Swiss-Prot record:
This is Ribosome rescue factor SmrB. HAMAP family: SmrB. GO terms for molecular function: RNA endonuclease activity; rRNA binding. Associates with collided ribosomes, but not with correctly translating polysomes. The keyword Transport does not apply. The lineage of its organism: Bacteria, Pseudomonadati, Pseudomonadota, Gammaproteobacteria, Enterobacterales. PANTHER family: DNA ENDONUCLEASE SMRA-RELATED, UPF0115 PROTEIN YFCN. It is an enzyme of class 3 (hydrolase). Residues 98-173 form the Smr domain. It comes from Serratia proteamaculans (strain 568). The keyword RNA-binding applies. Keywords: Endonuclease, Hydrolase, Nuclease, RNA-binding, rRNA-binding.
Length: 176
């Protein structure tokens, strides 16, 4: 393959002489994330089963003890409260997002179950659930459901850039 603009030896020598004192710039502004492993296509029936299995944990009768004052937050018993602080101050950024606007409670439970299953399957540690304000039904129920799931380690009301009082950031326990 021929070069479109071949340089003569004199031109190459002139270029090398002109850049001999150049210093390499240090790149410190862009964070390179690790490439995600390619995920296999999953059969729709298996996805549906994952949704059903994961939503099995969500009960409307059980009311976990959540703090009523301040922002919505939860730390699984036996887990470090420092992770909650790191989540609150933005050390984690969500990689998966779920928007529950316009869904019924049953649909929302299934979608939450699917989100948690997807996080575990794709090795995503942090996710964001946008429940919205609306009639406050999903806003009240979402934290109660999340606190019941054994794979949810921590959740906290999202900062403004991720939805504020209309969203929750959560950390999911990953399979080894």
């Amino acid at each position: 393959m021929k070069n479109k603009h071949p340089l003569s030896k004199d031109e190459l020598q002139l270029f090398r002489e002109s850049v001999v004192d150049a210093k390499k710039l240090r790149q410190d502004t862009i964070v390179h994330r690790k490439p995600k492993p390619k995920t296999k296509q999953i059969a729709p029936q298996r996805l549906l089963q994952e949704q059903v299995d994961a939503s099995h944990y969500f009960s409307d009768e059980y009311q976990p003890q959540l703090e009523e004052e301040g922002p919505t937050r939860y730390v699984r018993p036996g887990y470090s409260a420092f992770e909650l602080k790191k989540l609150r101050r933005g050390d984690y950024s969500p990689e998966l997002f779920l928007d529950l606007h316009g869904l019924t409670q049953m649909q929302a439970k299934q979608e939450l179950g699917a989100l948690i299953a997807a996080c575990r399957r794709e090795h995503v540690h942090c996710a964001c659930v946008m429940h919205g304000h609306g009639k406050h039904i999903l806003k009240q129920q979402t934290p109660l459901w999340l606190a019941q799931h054994p794979d949810v380690l921590v959740f906290h009301q999202a900062p403004k850039e991720w939805g504020g009082t209309a969203a929750i950031l959560l950390l999911v326990e990953l399979a080894e």
